[in-house]
């Protein structure tokens, strides 16, 4: 597997928000842009890093939320002024909140994403155009005054040019667990996370993988400010992304600590 050692620098982030309010039509909008650079070691291409520009637009009205985004990613040799294999990723998501109160909340998201790959110096590959369809329910349930059960489940279907891009045709991703509130300042959330790529077509073996983690968050609220230390503990992780050269699954072990 290719090994990445990212050192991420946010070099540009711009955003603006506006609201248009009418008596029966209350729309809220925000729009922004970001340019992200990652230093990459051992990527397999003689490049300095990854370039990841993106722009986004969000709109909300009552129970509806609409999100549009455009993202691009690919390795770049900045000194030579050239890039390696890269892709475009326009995306649309629509979320509807069916129910929302202190006892129970339930919403549903539908989405579409297109991957436009542009291969550079890869024999037998020129371009690929792959689509991903998404449906994702989310929930929040009050068990007691201090204990809640919440989470989300995303189900994806990939189509077109999968043998070129190396993706599996189906994927599920979920994070769900319990949150206990000790007081107005401290709360603890412990979740189970799973992401699994697999093929519904038994004749296919490309792009299969599995990641299982325990994710713990310590939510600290200090007046108008909040900070959340977190950790991710790997339970099981393997992948089959090198399926064209080696169909054996490769194991991994990644843990993480962080702050946001």
PLM region spans:
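Repeated loop/turn-to-beta-strand initiation elements of outer-membrane beta-barrel proteins
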Residues: 63-68, 101-108, 145-151, 180, ...
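Residues that define the transmembrane beta-barrel architecture of outer-membrane proteins
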Residues: 27, 47-53, 84-90, 127-135, ...
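Predominantly the C-terminal beta-signal and adjacent terminal strand-loop region
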Residues: 192-260
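Residues on the lipid-exposed face of transmembrane beta-strands in outer-membrane beta-barrel proteins
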Residues: 33-35, 55-61, 92-96, 135-141, ...
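Transmembrane beta-strands of outer-membrane beta-barrel pores
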Residues: 35-41, 61-63, 70-76, 98, ...
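Short glycine/proline- and aromatic-enriched beta-strand/turn motifs that initiate or cap beta-hairpins
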Residues: 20-80
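Flexible, solvent-exposed loop segments that connect beta-strands
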Residues: 39-47, 74-85, 116-130, 159-169, ...
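Cleavable N-terminal export/targeting peptides
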Residues: 1-30
